[in-house]
């Protein structure tokens, strides 16, 4: 009895503190109000988990989703405000950073309903899973607003540590343990290389850590063309390359995709790329302003390797998740075109637009993999044969997302790639755009091969997995379908109304 009274008092006191802090932040303003909402959500998750039983599990999902939606709302209310630098220059808020934060929050918001049924069926620890997702989201948001080299290093570590834990969440699975080990080792090595690059920038600029001050320091010390800057550029490119996973920094991607829980893969496949892209645009554009030719060349090489290797190797894959891993390597090659073009020819606007479409296309495809995998226990591409005869909605939604990934008109992926390639062509990247067009045709081949399997109607070609396919009786199945419907709509309809989306993206340029 005393224990229950103490718990009730603890909850009441914590709620009062939460409401007071919320009131102060809401009416007195804050540079990191959206991030604070997620922090309060994390605190509430811990409170409910420590003071309740299993019957309160729906509240955990509700609090997580509500925190993310409220954070998105706070970002939208802050739209078009004047850029601000806070925390002694460590953090900057402007429209450009906030659009990437919005994309990260959107990814997390869609991933939570996508994960509900998987967590229930596999009996994973729910609270810890949600805590890691929200904390990783928080790290990604801080990375988008980072304005100095220390924050750019610390923020992705917050994201990465949660990613390592999520990838090894099914600890009884040997493949998951192997994926986590590779992910951790590669992540640690890349972080070391990234710090090495920042140390060269720090020394060459005369001890500066803020991005703009590094440029001023390089001018004062006359070190902007020194060999140390070249070493810094190569090291930082390698470090960021691990997060973006372009070739040849892609070795960890297929194994982590295959061994990690599917909802985790869905989350990592988009959030890490969005956060790393936001960081890359600022790092290459500001500290390496005087080395633009050099980093353009480096990124062009990475883009070409990614588009060619990613799409060619994807053809040979038999696992759906490994195929999407190599597909994502090719997709990041297209995104790099936007980074190279920059804001002079709407490169950043086209990159942001394409990443918005990529989120919906990729998460829609992973929602189908989660749903099919829970009912059949397989991830083999051939086992999808004849799915249309058992679940037309799942097969058709999968086909739309795959066609959009391939870039077929009139879907969103086509218009996203078209605008991205057009911006690259206007910027004079003729060879890079030509490679992108050719590899896009290659990607259409393996996407259509999967769609052909999905639509197979002849009984002799339907696999035993599909013959025994049964729709789930769980209520949580609706949450996967909800995520899938949202992603399918976002993968199709926005292509018809590209101009408003491009205009919004153009308004974000710093």
Swiss-Prot record:
Whose protein is this, by species?
Chloranthus spicatus
NCBIfam families, A to Z: NDH_I_N, PRK02504.1
Q: How does it assemble?
A: NDH is composed of at least 16 different subunits, 5 of which are encoded in the nucleus.
Organism's domain of life? Answer: Eukaryota
Q: Which family does it belong to?
A: Belongs to the complex I subunit 2 family.
Q: Which UniProt keywords are present, listed alphabetically?
A: Chloroplast, Membrane, NAD, NADP, Plastid, Plastoquinone, Quinone, Thylakoid, Translocase, Transmembrane, Transmembrane helix, Transport
Classification lineage: Eukaryota, Viridiplantae, Streptophyta, Embryophyta, Tracheophyta
What name appears for this protein in its UniProt entry? NAD(P)H-quinone oxidoreductase subunit 2 A, chloroplastic
Q: What does this protein do?
A: NDH shuttles electrons from NAD(P)H:plastoquinone, via FMN and iron-sulfur (Fe-S) centers, to quinones in the photosynthetic chain and possibly in a chloroplast respiratory chain. The immediate electron acceptor for the enzyme in this species is believed to be plastoquinone. Couples the redox reaction to proton translocation, and thus conserves the redox energy in a proton gradient.
Q: How does it sit in the membrane?
A: Multi-pass membrane protein
> Which catalysed reactions does the entry list for this protein?
a plastoquinone + NADH + (n+1) H(+)(in) = a plastoquinol + NAD(+) + n H(+)(out); a plastoquinone + NADPH + (n+1) H(+)(in) = a plastoquinol + NADP(+) + n H(+)(out)
Gene Ontology cellular component terms for the protein in this record: chloroplast thylakoid membrane
Give TM regions: 24-44, 57-77, 99-119, 124-144, 150-170, 183-203, 227-247, 295-315, 323-343, 347-367, 395-415, 418-438, 484-504
UniProt record, GO biological process? ATP synthesis coupled electron transport; photosynthesis, light reaction
Q: Tell me the InterPro entries matching this sequence.
A: NADH-Q_OxRdtase_suN/2, ND/Mrp_TM, Ndh2_N
Q: What is its EC number?
A: 7.1.1.-
As for subcellular location, the record says: Plastid, Chloroplast thylakoid membrane
User: Which is one GO molecular function term here?
Assistant: quinone binding
**Where is this protein primarily located?**
plastid
